[in-house]
Swiss-Prot record:
Domains as described in the record: The histidine triad, also called HIT motif, forms part of the binding loop for the alpha-phosphate of purine mononucleotide.
Gene3D superfamilies: 2.60.200.20, HIT-like (3.30.428.10)
Ranges of biased composition (kind: Polar residues): 123-133
Histidine triad motif (motif): residue ranges: 263-267
Name of encoding gene: aptx
Organism of derivation: Xenopus tropicalis
EC number, UniProt record: 3.6.1.71, 3.6.1.72
Gene Ontology cellular-component annotations: nucleolus; nucleoplasm
Domain FHA-like, chain residue ranges per copy: 23-72
Protein name per Swiss-Prot or TrEMBL: Aprataxin
Amino acid sequence: MIECWLVSKDGKHGRIRLPHAETVVIGRGPETQITDKKCSRHQVQLMADCNKGYVKVKQLGTNPTSIDGVDIGKEQKVDLKPGHTLHIVNNLYPYVIEFLEGATNPHAKRENENRSSSKRTQENSLNEGTGTSMKLMKKESNISPSSSSGKNSSCSTEEKYNAQEVKSQGHWSQGLKASMQDPTMQVFKDDKVVVIKDKYPKARYHWLVLPWQSIANLKVLRAEHLELVQHMHAVGQKIAKEHSDSKCAPFQLGYHAIPSMSHVHLHVISQDFDSPCLKNKKHWNSFTTDYFLESQAMIEMIKTHGKVNVKDGVSELLKTPLMCHICRKEQANMPQLKEHLKKHWPT
């Protein structure tokens, strides 16, 4: 049975178990060893879903609780996934969550944790000893939504990043890291990036460009990543260009402000949004509001500021009314919106 644990990144105290589907409230107190008066004794409410691999976080206190630097908002709820960092208050007291196989007694649980720690140490040693050279992979021709790469070569740079991700491929929110290594999903790869088909495409054409380097989210990006994100953009443009014609909707390249999956990825998506996987308002607004950060704009942001600025409260954009991205007419529901889109992009 999978168990969820809240782990202090400061290492100030032992991990806190979050039972499946049970409410746990933490804040200032002996359990967390937080003495900061700006932190309420009931600062956050946590509820783990061990089946889906995330924790629902609700801010109860007055001062801000945040995930990866983005404030949640009082009485608001946000999903915390493995690989992301929860700061209890005022960007202080960082925590992460881990999902582990449950044990039958506390002694066995400690052994599980020790084995996990030992495994991480061994993987770190492996990473340090891995080389950094890599051969450039030739892109397979005739990329299409249903096509896949027919070749899979091993190369040391790719293996280095693979080793870093092995321990986290078991949870759904880490699914991109597993798909990156799946030859049937790959349509292109080189020494810096891999392109895969989106497993649940939200349009006729929908790919993801991912760096081999492990980068959790946009907040981590800095000036030293500029060359990498420019390369990701160039690769995305190349793939889009191969499918651009008079009958095809234009493409958009960009990133979700707060991605649902861990590991930075660039969306290359056609603007027809003709897909059965596009099911709800959240899906739609994640691509048609400012929640979707255009790739070129993000590159300019890194050039100018040396980082990516994600606006506070950006998640609220996912709740805005459904509106056609072409004519800006508001639609009552998803079926009506999908029918309306056919006027712009006939099948």
